[in-house]
Amino acid sequence: MWGIGRRGKATVGDVDDALRALGWNVTWETTWQGLARTGRPGRVARLDRGWSTVWYRPAHGGSHAEGDVVRVRNIGADVAVGDWVVVSDDVERIEFVLPRQSAFMRRASFEGQRAEAHVIAANIDVVFLLHALVAPPNQRRLERELVLAFDSGAQPVLVLSKLDLMDNANEVERRMAALEAVAPGVDIHVVSGLRGDGVDALRRYAAGYRTVALLGASGVGKSTIVNTLVGGQVQSTAAVREGDQRGRHTTTAVQLVALPSDPVGAAGWLIDTPGVRAVSLWSSGTGIERAFTDVFELGEKCRFRDCKHDDEPGCAVQAAVQAGDLDARRLESMKRLVAEEAALEDEQKARLKVEDRRGFRKRKT
């Protein structure tokens, strides 16, 4: 029976086997023991309008044993799929959300509205960024996705889908090279969800009960890849428009999906998400620096440390642009992201000042 956690550093022997199969590890066990809380820890598998589906152990044969899954209210709890939470002893509510080790989030509000964070997936180890080979390479979108992925604390992996629809190997190489150019150092996989090409390589990222998240625009083939990874029909699929290769949302809710075991290791977990149209920045971390390592490395050679890479003398970045070693569009993209991040920081600071003045801001206890 779950009770008050013990203080101190946990060992492997302290980790419950059922929770371990959901991704629980020694780090989580140590955190749990240090909380000294009553209740029972579990993982959020799905959110539905104020309700959380929480798993205590993974599904067996596609269904849960009685008592292994509960549906509880999110009263006063800011939760996301993938979160580890503590459910009250009476199984009525979520009492506490354990501190996240990683979180993929973006700005949720539209222009003109107050900025709010939207956590898409929590406690993930890897983020699969899906782009369809049948569509023209969207370098600017990928750059934004990489910033968010690096800021999340997870490892970004670029997945190029719908290989089965490409009959020109040279065009595949060209489109792959275009996206690879703005993803230095990032793992890249070319796959066909329909035929299964390259899918086993993706499954290995989740081996050992790790959690991967799948993100991309509508129509890139997420649902087909999910079904192939899982080995069954988890999501419905839909055709895309031939004119612009845009698709319809076939995934309507974020959910945690079990991946089967394979010869290279234990099973893992996949967080499937609806198609993301707008990729807006939220957190201010090292994401831009890590997504634009090529630009920042050039910046280290500039004459002035505070060089803006405009028309300053001795600017190594502008020199690289003039020499054709750096795409001017990539530099402008980075500048836009830096400006967007700065504006967001200013907006957040201004809002906190107003909330402090009006007494609305939550105080730490």
Each language-model region and where it sits:
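Helix-rich effector regions associated with P-loop NTPase G domains
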Residues: 1-19, 38, 59, 70, ...
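Structural detector for short beta-strands of small beta-barrel domains
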Residues: 37-48
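Short aromatic-glycine-enriched beta-strand elements
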Residues: 50-54
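Short, charged beta-turn/beta-strand-edge "cap" motif at the junction between a beta-strand
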Residues: 89-94, 135, 218
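Phosphate-binding glycine-rich loops and their immediate beta-loop-alpha structural context
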Residues: 116-123, 129-182, 189
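Canonical P-loop GTPase G-domain recognition
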Residues: 155, 165-220
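A conserved segment at the C-terminal end of the G1
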Residues: 222-238
